[in-house]
Amino acid sequence: MSLNDSIKRGEYLVKTIGCHDCHSPKAMTERGPQLIAELALSGHQAGDSLPPMAPETIKNGWMLMNGQLTAFVGPWGVSFSANITSDDTGIGNWSMQRFKLAMREGKLKGDKNGRMMLPPMPWENFAKLNDEDLESMFKYLKSTKAINNAVPAPIPPTRLDSLKSA
């Protein structure tokens, strides 16, 4: 497969598998959430605040998302969607090997000694993709517009009280 065909296949996979669902900020409209094109695949935006929430909500079995659909709250704490653009704050300095390790083993940033990715990242599904598909996705993501956005670190469950409403 040519490089151009591989990038097109990667774009198709990224769009149909649902990467934009979590990794692209949305604006809420009368028709529901709409992707903010200029922030596509850049993850949860650095500096964005989270709305207040009652930690009891999580203790009672609920999970929540913020309005941009890039922050997720559950028993694991708060996780933020990663920047997967070609910028160095995204996957710009990743190798194919790191990408495959992240997708196949769920290792954060493809670091074999690092922690596991947090929910709702469905890496177990991506682990089933063949090499050609993962390579095409990686080539497409590396071809995207670089968006500088250092996504915040997750908030552990022990700090959910910091999100309480006033």
Regions from the language model: what does each represent?
Residues Y12-S24, R98-R104, E135-K139:
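C-type cytochrome heme c attachment motif
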Residues D21, T29, S86:
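Active-site micro-motifs of SAM-dependent methyltransferase domains
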Residues S24-S79, M96, L108-A166:
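Flexible coil segments in periplasmic/lumen-exposed cytochrome c-class electron-transfer proteins
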